[in-house]
């Protein structure tokens, strides 16, 4: 396609989208409006601008289909009480003395098995408030522990962001998940270190904020069955060279999980809930696709590459930098991963970086500043433990350190050590 938008148009598309999101316009509409105005200002006529937007949205459709079917597993985990049971078991096994480590690991595990980061934090939040009250730990410490764990789990999970980067760079979902394991482990370590330093900084939990949870939950074995089945099916590719698409593996895990818990009659209810959760993500990705269509056909890539060269950075630095910038612009890991991988992916691989390393570095980069205040994650996580705005804002740099640590490790590990042809 020969339609070209100026770098100014692409930047304005991003800026307008961010401004509208801050003004509480629905993010999908904000992205579409930003893309439209940016394309027109960038020199394309109305017809060409719409064409670019449509083509960008089309590029998201296969990822959207996989994300929608992943709703079966997510719905089962959340609605059946399986996610709560997994978190409670991990925390009880590690004990009160290792409270922050327990919160970090429990949120990481929940996210790693397919629960959204914000939902994982909200799920663990009631338990964290009780622990914080008993251990005299501040809200800042427990929230950072949960968010850091969630960020670590997010880069090794079959979540929408992982699906988006694997699809856009034509590498298997399993490969991207495995490539994130080492960075995720270091992410957990740095989270535990920083959260420990925050135990006496910030506000403490009041007695009235602790809510007892008397909800009946399934056994741990039945709760973990669904995620284990899904991960097992995805792992058949590297183990036995049997490729089972996430489109099949994730819902099958959800179905087997609900059978294991003896709640088959509620499968439709759980699946409907999961679909409702994924629908918002799918719609957001359509809006993201329109923005990606404008940016990918603009001179912005050349400007960023030129800037990297001017700073003397290596060419592969474009991968994590694009992830950081796009996730920060959209305040969303999923949107950032989708835009960065679809817009910059082919350019990065043309510079000699393997598709898998590109996917992993973009993915890790998207965890650095995806928590900015113009996104929903900032507010939903803070609200889960009744944290005030000022205290929540002070956590952003610490969250960024966790994401940046994982990004640096990802660059060191995936680009410098993984074989260029490795794709499992």
Set out the residue ranges of the language-model regions.
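Alpha-helical transmembrane segments of multi-pass membrane proteins
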Residues: 97-110, 135-155, 176-179, 185, ...
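Hydrophobic alpha-helical transmembrane segments of multi-pass integral membrane proteins
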Residues: 68-70, 94-127, 286, 311-353, ...
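Core transmembrane alpha-helical segments of multi-pass membrane transporters/permeases
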Residues: 29-32, 48-84, 108-109, 247, ...
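Membrane-core helix-loop-helix motifs of multi-pass transport proteins
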Residues: 129-221, 354, 377-410
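Conserved small/polar residues in nucleotide/adenosyl-binding loops
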Residues: 414-420
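Re-entrant/interfacial helical elements at transmembrane boundaries that shape
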Residues: 72, 85-87, 118-131, 159-169, ...
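Short helix-coil transition sites and intra-membrane helix breaks within transmembrane domains
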Residues: 23-27, 61-63, 74-84, 111-123, ...
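Long, contiguous bundles of hydrophobic transmembrane helices that form the permeation core
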Residues: 2-10, 14, 37, 41-42, ...
């Amino acid at each position: 396609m020969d339609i070209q938008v100026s770098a100014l148009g692409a930047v304005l598309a991003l800026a307008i989208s961010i401004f509208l999101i801050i003004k509480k316009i629905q993010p999908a509409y904000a992205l579409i409006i930003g893309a439209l105005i940016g394309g027109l200002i960038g020199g394309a006529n109305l017809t060409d601008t719409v064409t670019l937007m449509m083509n960008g949205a089309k590029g998201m459709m296969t990822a959207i289909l996989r994300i929608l079917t992943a709703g079966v597993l997510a719905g089962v985990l959340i609605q059946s009480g399986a996610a709560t049971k997994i978190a409670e078991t991990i925390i009880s096994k590690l004990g009160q003395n290792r409270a922050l480590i327990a919160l970090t690991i429990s949120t990481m595990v929940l996210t790693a098995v397919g629960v959204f980061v914000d939902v994982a934090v909200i799920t663990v939040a009631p338990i964290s408030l009780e622990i914080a009250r008993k251990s005299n730990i501040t809200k800042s410490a427990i929230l950072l522990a949960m968010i850091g764990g969630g960020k670590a789990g997010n880069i090794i999970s079959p979540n929408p962001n992982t699906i988006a980067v694997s699809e856009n760079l034509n590498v298997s979902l399993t490969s991207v998940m495995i490539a994130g394991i080492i960075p995720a482990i270091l992410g957990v370590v740095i989270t535990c270190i920083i959260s420990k330093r925050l135990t006496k900084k910030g506000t403490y939990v009041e007695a009235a904020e602790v809510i007892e949870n008397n909800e009946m939950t399934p056994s741990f074995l039945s709760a973990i069955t669904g995620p284990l089945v899904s991960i097992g099916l995805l792992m058949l590719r590297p183990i036995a060279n049997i490729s089972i698409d996430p489109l099949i593996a994730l819902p099958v895990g959800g179905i087997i999980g609900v059978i294991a818990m003896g709640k088959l009659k509620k499968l439709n209810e759980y699946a409907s809930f999961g679909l409702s959760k994924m629908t918002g993500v799918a719609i957001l990705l359509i809006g993201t696709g329109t923005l990606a269509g404008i940016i990918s056909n603009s001179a912005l890539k050349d400007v960023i590459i030129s800037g990297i060269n001017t700073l003397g950075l290596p060419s592969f630095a474009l991968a994590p930098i694009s992830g950081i910038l796009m996730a920060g612009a959209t305040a969303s890991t999923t949107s950032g991963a989708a835009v960065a991988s679809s817009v910059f992916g082919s350019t990065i691989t043309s510079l000699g970086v393997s598709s898998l390393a590109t996917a992993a570095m973009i993915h890790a980069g998207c965890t650095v500043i995806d928590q900015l205040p113009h996104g929903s994650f900032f507010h939903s996580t803070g609200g889960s433990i009744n944290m005030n705005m000022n205290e929540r804002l002070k956590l952003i740099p610490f969250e960024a350190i966790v994401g940046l640590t994982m990004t640096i490790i990802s660059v060191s590990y995936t680009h410098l050590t993984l074989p260029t042809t490795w794709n499992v």
